[in-house]
Amino acid sequence: MDADRIVFKVKNQLVSVKPEVIVDQYEYKYPAIVDRQKPSITLGKAPDLNKAYKSILSGLTAAKLDPDDVCSYLAAAMELFDGTCPDDWTSYGILIAKKGDKITPATLVNIQRTDVEGNWALTGGLDLTRDPTVAEHASLVGLLLSLYRLSKVSGQNTGNYKTNVADRMEQIFETAPFAKIVEHHTLMTTHKMCANWSTIPNFRFLAGTYDMFFSRIEHLYSAIRVGTVVTAYEDCSGLVSFTGFIKQINLTAKEAILYFFHKNFEEEIKRMFEPGQETAVPHSYFIHFRSLGLSGKSPYSSNAVGHVFNLIHFVGCYMGQIRSLNATVISSCAPHEMSVLGGYLGEEFFGKGTFERRFFRDEKELKEYEAAESVKTDTALADDGTVNSDDEDFFSGETRSPEAVYTRIMMNGGRLKKSHIRRYVSVSSNHQARPNSFAEFLNKTYSSDPR
């Protein structure tokens, strides 16, 4: 019989079926540029820059912006921000610019234009007869791109977080080298009238292009990045979290993965480290692949690597990190099991400190110290890891090898110890939990645990 089939009875009738599930037709897509052409978009006819400025500024003042006109203006304004390429700049086999070339944000991409005229209406509330200065253009560009960052702020953020962010960004574009062009709080008012700027593909593309340019090129107006920085590694929260995790525990990626004791990590680790990607290439198109339209469904998002994401943030919660406590649990990716593993790893890598001597009076003292430490290491590696630290308060967990940590988990029946639960409850109960956050999960799951 087919090994994939199961047999059972329905009303005394023998039934044999092959269980199958719906195949996800919307597969994860790795960023790639197969034709060696720069990322491109198509916009309407290029406007007169000064006329466009006056139209967009009047729309911003009246909180009535035409997205197509905004995108057309942002693309046209790129010519105002020129800089010198510090080195040969290549990505995915494409030569973006050579060392010493004068470049603008438009150099990074291909912006095609049609003959379709923009609207360029004057909404009102503006009486500007003179042509704007470069500083005023820069302020308008900065304010428009700030709408992208505001639209990315989660609705779960409590209090006045979004208003405070808007105020800080406006303050940047009111002071030199920028110029004040609108009344304070205009940005937040405009955002409320259209809160979904990050979902407009062309606007997202231009925000990513500006960010990619200013992240590499030193420029008088680099502060424009305050609104676009969220396009860097967008939809890469799984990969970004893993990168931060290995820095915290001071291990290489290879060493860290040895502690991932769960079968569901296999597919995610394979997905996250697909060969041929420019994940470690500085200033690559990869960094902005979502905004530049190089991937429809990111394989590096928290949903794509949910078990890895959950584990990392449970470890972060164990250490009381606000970012982890506020993060949203991926509920379909074994959060209970990940919280157990997170407790053990949190204790092993953070709970006991990682202190060691690094500086010495002379080379002789250094060698003596290294010799003494090697003896301690040999002793630690011989430890079978069977000591229960709940029973022996002074057990220091000398070895943190994957084998020793795994043994400790198995010796406790794959369950958290009392000390882990106390720690989880302590950090989560003292935190204002957001809906579906790690703090809420830990509080609900372990606050009533009888252990």
From Swiss-Prot:
Pfam families on file: Rhabdo_ncap
- Subcellular localization(s) per the UniProt record: Virion; Host cytoplasm
- Please name the Gene3D superfamilies in this protein's record: Nucleoprotein, Rhabdovirus nucleocapsid protein like domain
Q: Which residues carry this modification: Phosphoserine?
A: 389
Keywords of the record, alphabetical order, are: Capsid protein, Helical capsid protein, Host cytoplasm, Phosphoprotein, Ribonucleoprotein, RNA-binding, Superantigen, Viral nucleoprotein, Virion
Q: Which GO terms describe its molecular function?
A: RNA binding
Highest taxon in the source lineage = Viruses
The record's section on SUPFAM superfamilies has: Rhabdovirus nucleoprotein-like
InterPro entries for the chain: Rhabdo_ncapsid, Rhabdovirus_ncapsid_C, Rhabdovirus_ncapsid_N, Rhabdovirus_nucleoprotein-like
Maturation and modification: Phosphorylated by host CK2. Unphosphorylated protein N seems to have a better affinity for leader viral promoter encapsidation. Phosphorylation of protein N in ribonucleocapsid may stabilize the interaction with protein P, thereby playing an important role in viral transcription/replication.
GO CC annotations, alphabetized: helical viral capsid; host cell cytoplasm; ribonucleoprotein complex; viral nucleocapsid
- KW RNA-binding (keyword) present: yes
Q: Does the keyword Transit peptide apply?
A: no
Q: Which family does it belong to?
A: Belongs to the lyssavirus nucleocapsid protein family.
A further note on this protein reads: Displays a superantigen activity in human and mouse, activating mostly V-beta-8 subtypes of T-cell receptor.
Record's subunit section: Homomultimerizes to form the nucleocapsid. Binds to viral genomic RNA. In nucleocapsid, binds protein P and thereby positions the polymerase on the template. Protein P acts as a chaperone on free protein N to prevent it from aggregation before encapsidating genomic RNA.
Q: What does this protein do?
A: Encapsidates the genome in a ratio of one protein N per nine ribonucleotides, protecting it from nucleases. If expressed without protein P it binds non-specifically RNA and therefore can bind it's own mRNA. Interaction with protein P abolishes any non-specific RNA binding, and prevents phosphorylation. The soluble N-P complex encapsidates specifically the genomic RNA, with protein N protecting the genome like a pearl necklace. The encapsidated genomic RNA is termed the nucleocapsid (NC) and serves as template for viral transcription and replication.
Output this protein's name.
Nucleoprotein
Q: Which organism is it from?
A: Khujand virus (KHUV)
Instruction: Tell me the organism's taxonomic lineage.
Output: Viruses, Riboviria, Orthornavirae, Negarnaviricota, Haploviricotina
